[in-house]
UniProtKB/Swiss-Prot annotation:
InterPro entries: BTF3 (IPR039370), NAC_A/B_dom_sf (IPR038187), Nas_poly-pep-assoc_cplx_dom (IPR002715). This is Nascent polypeptide-associated complex subunit beta. Its main location: cytoplasm. It holds the Pfam family NAC. It comes from the Eukaryota. It comes from Mycosarcoma maydis (Corn smut fungus). Component of the nascent polypeptide-associated complex (NAC), a dynamic component of the ribosomal exit tunnel, protecting the emerging polypeptides from interaction with other cytoplasmic proteins to ensure appropriate nascent protein targeting. The NAC complex also promotes mitochondrial protein import by enhancing productive ribosome interactions with the outer mitochondrial membrane and blocks the inappropriate interaction of ribosomes translating non-secretory nascent polypeptides with translocation sites in the membrane of the endoplasmic reticulum. Part of the nascent polypeptide-associated complex (NAC), consisting of EGD2 and EGD1. NAC associates with ribosomes via EGD1. Belongs to the NAC-beta family. The gene is EGD1. SMART domains: NAC.
Length: 166
């Protein structure tokens, strides 16, 4: 029986299960679920003796640049006696315009100033848009009518002078 030495070597290498030179099996990574909270965070919260605050649907933190750090369904722990709260979850940077309808009751005096600026800029933008539309509509109508170049009274006088000369 004649066997190809290369095929035989491949079969032997594939059947090898242990010993020196064999590759190690890789462990499948375990997926971390939403319950996998940071142990350091939990230890720090335990030192502060904070308790979980339930019923918090969203948290909005207003920045100085006018943007809002928005947490949808965050986890909140707090100790009201020491005015200490921990908010953690996935925070997203959003502009104030994205949250305007539902955020009006949360605005304080500092944020009302930025809301006024936002409203003024929005009105100015609408005015510019309306002016550009009016200008565009006005230029369409003017294309059909030629511009008046000379005075009709002077042209009429010139014609009467020409008629007199003839």
């Amino acid at each position: 029986m004649v066997l190809n030495q290369e095929k035989l070597a491949k079969l032997q290498a594939a059947s090898r299960t242990g010993g020196k030179g064999t590759p190690r099996r890789k462990m499948a990574p375990k997926p971390k679920g939403p319950g996998g909270e940071d142990p350091k965070l939990q230890a720090a919260l335990k030192k502060l003796q904070v308790e979980p605050v339930s019923g918090v649907e969203e948290v909005n933190m207003f920045k100085e640049d006018g943007n809002v750090l928005h947490f949808a369904a965050p986890k909140v722990h707090g100790l009201p006696t020491s005015n200490t709260f921990a908010v953690y979850g996935n925070g997203v940077d959003k502009e104030l315009t994205e949250l305007v309808p539902g955020i009006l009751n949360q605005l304080g005096p500092d944020s009302l100033a930025s809301l006024r600026k936002l409203a003024e800029s929005y009105q100015a933008m609408n005015a510019q848009h309306a002016a550009s539309q009016a200008a565009a509509a006005g230029t369409k109508d003017d294309d059909d009518v030629p511009d008046v170049v000379e005075n009709f009274d002077e042209a009429d006088k010139k014609e009467t002078e020409v008629d007199k000369l003839d």
